[in-house]
Amino acid sequence: MIIDSHEHLILPIEMQIKKLKEAGVDKAILFTTTPHPEKANTMQEFKNEMSVLFKVLSGEKNHKNDMKRMENNINDLIEALKKYPDKFYGFGPVPLGLNLDETISWIEKYIVSNNLKGVGEFTPGNDEQVKQLETIFQALGNYSYLPIWVHTFYPVTLNGINILMELTKKYPKVSVIFGHIGGYNWMNIIDFVKETPNAYLDLSASFSSLVVKMAIAEVPNKCLYSSDAPYGEPLLNKQMIEYLCKDKEVINNILGGNISKLLNLNL
């Protein structure tokens, strides 16, 4: 079973299924999204869509609007999961800045009740927002089967990554997926994941195939195939793993076995 462990919802959803079929991928784990760059046909349209993403990544957020946006995005995600249950699993967002009880209530209402498999993607725009993740970690103590997926490329700094590492060690029952292998800080993250049982590597959006090669060499049982579609292509990311690794068992684990085990999918 080949599973793309990190894709954002593409519209129309049939386009997403077509890409999976072309790549020879059986299932994908969908994450919510606000921008839809796949809709853009011109550079200006693309810039308009990406401006929304940059605001999210920079931490330019309004708490009330943020929660409403998340609710709408979750509804879009659930609609896709219900329409194609044989093709998709889902992760759902959780707002930062809530207290512990509010966070647990949100997880119950939007994550657990919808049978989502984890929480995220979290895109902290500054170190203070990384620190706010501790409330999420505390809440997940009640749901140890739900991993947390955190964006660790720009604008997350090395200091922010160090804060996330400390949280990962402080809450060993919470599985943490380090999204995009930490960007330019990939060596720090690979070393950390190698020594930390509850830490995992998302292989999407790496800036070099060498990064993926080193991750596979050091922590093959912690590597998760993903494309970050529509920002990456399921086929190309799958081919890169197959090219860089010659061990069939390791390839099969990275392409689906590792994430199946992490999420207890029982496929």
Identify the meaning behind each predicted range.
Residues 117-118, 125-224:
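Catalytic pocket-lining loop regions of alpha/beta-barrel enzymes
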Residues 2-5, 29-32, 91-92, 120, ...:
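Active-site neighborhood of phospho(di)ester-bond hydrolases with catalytic His/Asp-centered motifs
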Residues 1-72:
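An N-terminally biased module of ancient metal coordination in phosphate/nucleic-acid-related enzymes
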Residues 6, 20, 77, 110, ...:
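Conserved, mostly hydrophobic/aromatic
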Residues 1-5, 15-27, 31, 142, ...:
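Mid-to-C-terminal alpha-helical segments outside catalytic/metal-binding sites
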